[in-house]
Amino acid sequence: MILQILIYVSSLLPIMHQTNAQSTLKLEISGLKNNKGFVLIAIFNSELGFPDKKELAVKKIRIPAQAGVISYDVQDLVPGTYALAIIHDENDNQRLDTGLFGIPKEGFCFSKGAMGTFGPPTFQAASFVHKAPNSSQKLQIKYW
């Protein structure tokens, strides 16, 4: 009986390894209007904190801004459901600057091109499934 249990458990090890395997999320961010500041990327795996509580993101990335298109590979991301919130932080103050009525002064975007009616989209609207070994997201920065 013990031998049968050991054989069964050992047959599950490859499956268990695959579900916890780290993989790469390839990002292509386009539409940046200049080289000022940084692009801030927050990756969330639940609606908790999405999109503005970056301290609750599973990964936070800061890369130099580059007009046009930026390609970036997020390494070691466990397969699962995620949503991205991205800001072109032109003045490097680590937040999205807004003006009258909360209208953004800096560029921003969300995964799947999601947009809210009056404010940011929900996690569900922006979420996508990241699968091993790699997946990709194309994102377009928007300015008002």
PLM regions: where:
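Contiguous segments within soluble domain cores/interaction surfaces
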Residues: L32-L56
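A short, amphipathic beta-strand motif
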Residues: L25-L32
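Acidic, glycine-anchored loop motifs typical of Ca2+
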Residues: E90-L96
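Extracellular beta-sheet/turn segments enriched in Thr/Pro/Gly and aliphatic residues
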Residues: G107-Y143
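A short tyrosine-centered beta-strand micro-motif
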Residues: Y82-I86
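Short proline/glycine- and polar residue-rich coil/turn motifs
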Residues: R62-G68, H130-A132
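Bacterial Sec-dependent N-terminal signal peptides
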Residues: M1-T24
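A glycine-anchored, Pro-Gly-centered beta-turn/N-cap motif
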Residues: G68, D73, V78-T81
